[in-house]
Regions:
Chain A
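Glycine-rich phosphate-binding loops at beta-strand->alpha-helix junctions
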Residues: 66-69, 197, 208-235, 243-250
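Gly/Thr-rich phosphate-binding beta-strand-loop-beta motif of the actin/hexokinase/Hsp70
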Residues: 2-23, 100-116, 291, 296-300
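Short beta-strand-loop/turn "lid" adjacent to the catalytic site in phosphate-handling enzymes
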Residues: 30-35, 53-86, 122-123
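Glycine-rich phosphate-binding loop plus the immediately following alpha-helix
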Residues: 35-39, 118-161, 169, 260, ...
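Glycine-rich phosphate-binding/hydrolytic loop that grips phosphoryl groups
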Residues: 91, 135-139, 244-271
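Acidic, glycine/GT-rich loop-and beta-edge segments that sit at the periphery of enzyme/chaperone cores
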Residues: 260-331, 335, 350-357
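Adenine-nucleotide phosphate-binding core of ATP-dependent small-molecule kinases
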Residues: 175-204
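Short glycine-rich, Thr/Ser-proximal phosphate-binding strand/loop in the N-terminal lobe
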Residues: 4-47, 124, 128-129
Length: 396, 348
């Protein structure tokens, strides 16, 4: 029986599932487009995994989930490790490329830069609120130009002339592309200009004043685009490596992290088993009206049994799952948690220091007439100098 | 006679001065009423009444003023902080705050007491800073001065605890003076060190504890709604949290004197001094600059810190908060940030 570790990356554009063995060899790899129902896609993915490998020989010993949709799927799978995609990506690429210095990662919804020194990630940057220059933007533009996304990158290399397209903002980029099209530039030229704009934007927003050193690794879904790869190489003036499994690096990384965590804790995996592919999952949400935050609370239901509750800021619904008695205690304290603890601690100290505190207080605020007089005098003097000061200030 | 109610918005410098104000109003026989904690509803109302391009802390402030207006208070107390040090002012939005409120909220029912604060230090207990308050409630100069003295003494005890390593978060939820007094007395006599100094702190399973300095204005780092409760999230992940309010004034002054030209804004300078102190400090693993989107002073501070963090080889990150920030992006960033430091430690 060999140990197998699952890694699942729930991105905005794709859902990736991998399985690695004890030696980090890839046993199974699946890259699917996220069509909007991650639970179903993960179930299908697992079913495929069950078909492709002979499960009798393997035991699922650890499960890791990453990506922007990691939380929900972690509940569904019963994951051992739930971690952000930055750590996961860094882990996988430093494993495959120990000499890596710079990792460019462009996914569907966000882009990241990871700086590596001696095989360890030491710095990272992530795009801010704007999605300019990410996979979904390219997707959208490919659709608008009527070019399949798979051919998009190749076309860019056919461009004869340079076109400058504004890369700062997707809205401007789009209007820029339309006007350039109307001037008579060809599709390849427009696409080439767009690729350059995307890389320029990446350099301005993420790299900023960082000094980049080699090797340069380019991964994430967009790394399949040879036009963008070429634009990166042109920009930094060096070769850029696209790893073989560039599209599932996040999943591989999280599988490795799950392996580490399971080993460290020495516990059995909390994986819910392959039976979950036959279970019916459902998510419902409601707006909690117990305080002014009106959180959207999400419930995950498996075969009509609630397995997870999330989305509440105060944690009272999340806690309600753990046990009724615990929940009751929590409901009271929900929105004014810190106040309650403060009150509690003061009550506790009431008992300890009851006598003391009264004494302390009395001493503290005892009015000493002599002292009072002197303080008042001092204050008055301060006051005078203050008033003089005020006049000065009015001129400032 | 029934005590008159004075509303204090739980926003901006509330987190810095609230013990002072609670004590002051109690000494003056007035009843302080604190606005509710920031919530989605409160922020939405504030946003609706604000200039769209203003920073989110001001929008929060406007939300709190509206909240107080519905609480049936007699007055709203909102001083105009102008200066806390010679030749240094606060951000222009503080200088113009009462005017901005008047302009943004023409329908405000409650009268606003807006004394101008001009002080030589963080101690704001001068009578000249409270003249309007005294006039409004016909308080004699003598009475006012004695109340101010007591308030500032009380505030000083709070500050000393902050310097000792307590976070403003440890107190900020308390609205009752009696409870606050007891908590302060308790902490003063507590043999157990505060979280930021606790050498026996336990991290989640198999992970190492890390020390992070969160550099940001009090109203950004201690408003749990607006920053997605980052302080507690960090604590849960096994982080000892440090903030600028723990750094002694002399240290901040010393660091500031290294700057060829200090900045114009009081709290920006304080953050700078504290951040430099933490960047040089071997006991600190990383520094997070938490800033509100569109903050003018921070656009300078952030750049300086970024450059200096590189020089001192300290792990550094900027976190930007705004009206609508998804929680997941904050978690992703702080998680990855902490992972960086843990990896570094593991490999040493």
């Amino acid at each position: 029986m060999n140990n197998l570790y699952l890694g699942v990356d729930i991105g905005s554009v794709s859902i990736n599932i991998v399985a690695i063995d004890e030696e980090n060899e890839l046993v199974f790899k699946l890259y699917t487009r996220n069509s909007g129902n991650p639970i179903e896609l993960v179930k299908e993915g697992l079913a495929k995994l069950r078909e492709e490998i002979e499960l009798e020989n393997y035991k699922i010993s650890g499960v890791g989930v990453t990506g922007s949709g990691r939380q929900l799927i972690a509940y569904v799978l019963g994951a051992d490790t739930v971690k952000n995609e930055i750590t996961a990506h860094a882990r996988a690429s430093t494993y495959y490329h120990p000499e890596a210095g710079t990792i460019f990662e462009i996914g569907g919804q966000d882009s990241k830069l990871i700086i590596v020194e001696d095989g360890i990630a030491v710095d990272f940057a992530m795009n801010t609120v704007c999605a300019a220059g990410t996979g979904s933007f390219l997707d959208h533009q490919a659709e608008r130009l009527g070019v399949p996304i798979e051919e998009f990158g190749g076309l860019a290399l056919e461009a004869d002339r340079d076109v400058r397209i504004a890369g700062r903002c997707t809205v401007f980029a789009e209007s820029d592309m339309i006007s350039k099209q109307q001037y008579g530039f060809t599709k390849p030229e427009i696409i080439n200009g767009l690729s350059e704009a995307l890389v320029r934007n990446y350099m301005n927003n993420l790299v900023r004043n960082r000094v980049l050193e080699g090797e340069y690794i380019f991964q994430g879904g967009v790394a399949a685009n040879i036009g963008i790869k070429a634009a990166f190489e042109e920009e930094i003036g060096a070769e850029v490596i696209v790893p073989e499994h560039h599209d599932v690096m996040g999943a591989i990384g999280i599988a490795m992290l799950a392996k580490r965590d399971v080993k460290r804790s020495g516990q059995e995996s909390s994986f819910r088993g392959f039976d979950l592919t036959e279970q019916e999952f459902e998510t419902t949400s409601f707006e909690c009206e117990d305080c002014a935050n009106n959180c959207e609370v999400i419930k995950v239901i498996a075969d009509s049994k609630v397995i997870a509750v999330t989305g509440d800021r105060c944690g009272k619904w999340t806690a309600s799952l753990i046990g009724d008695s615990a929940a009751n205690a929590n409901v009271e304290g929900s929105s004014e948690k810190e106040e309650k603890t403060a009150a509690k601690s003061s009550k506790k100290q009431d008992e300890d220091l009851n006598k003391n505190s009264e004494e302390l207080e009395a001493n503290l605020y005892k009015v000493d007439l002599e002292k009072e007089k002197q303080v008042m005098k001092e204050l008055e003097e301060l006051e005078k100098s203050d008033e003089n000061k005020k006049e000065d200030n009015s001129l400032v | 006679m029934k005590k008159r109610k004075v509303g204090i918005p739980r926003a901006l410098l509330y987190y810095y001065y609230f013990p002072f104000w609670l004590k002051l109003f109690s000494e003056l026989n007035l009843e302080p009423v604190i606005s509710d904690s920031t919530s989605r509803d409160l922020l939405n109302k504030g946003v609706k009444k604000s200039l769209s391009e203003i920073c989110v802390p001001i929008k929060v402030m406007i939300g709190h003023v509206l909240n107080l207006d519905q609480k049936d208070v007699d007055y709203i107390f909102m001083p105009r902080f102008r200066s806390l040090k010679k030749d240094v002012v606060l951000c222009p939005k503080f200088l113009g705050l009462p005017d901005m409120i008047r302009h943004s909220l023409p329908g405000l029912k409650t009268e606003v007491i807006a004394d101008q604060i001009d002080s030589k230090s963080d101690d704001i207990a001068q009578f000249s800073n409270h003249q309007k308050l005294a006039e409004t409630f016909s308080i004699t100069k003598r009475e006012m001065k004695s109340a101010l003295k007591k308030a500032t003494d009380f505030w000083q005890r709070y500050r000393d605890l902050l310097f000792k390593g307590y976070l403003i978060d440890d107190f900020a939820g308390i609205e009752e003076l009696e409870i606050l007094e007891k908590v302060i007395t308790k902490f003063e006599n507590d043999p157990k060190p505060p979280q930021s100094r606790d050498q026996n702190l336990e991290a989640p399973v198999n992970e190492e504890v890390v020390d992070i300095a969160v550099i940001g204005y009090v109203y950004n780092i201690f408003d749990q709604y607006i920053n997605m409760d980052i302080i507690n999230k960090l604590k849960e992940m096994g982080v000892r949290v440090h903030s600028f309010s723990m750094v002694a004034e002399e240290t901040i002054e010393k660091e500031l004197s290294n700057l060829r030209k200090p900045m114009f804004w009081e709290f920006t300078n304080k953050l700078y001094g504290a951040a430099e102190h933490y960047l040089k400090n071997d006991g600190i693993d990383g520094v997070i600059h938490l800033t509100a989107f569109g903050c003018g002073p921070d656009s300078m501070l952030g750049q300086i810190l970024e450059v200096d963090a590189k020089e001192y080889e300290k792990t550094f990150m900027t976190l930007r908060i705004d009206e609508q920030t998804g929680e997941s992006h904050i978690i992703t960033r702080i998680e990855a940030f902490i992972d960086l430091m843990r990896l570094k430690k593991e490999n040493n």
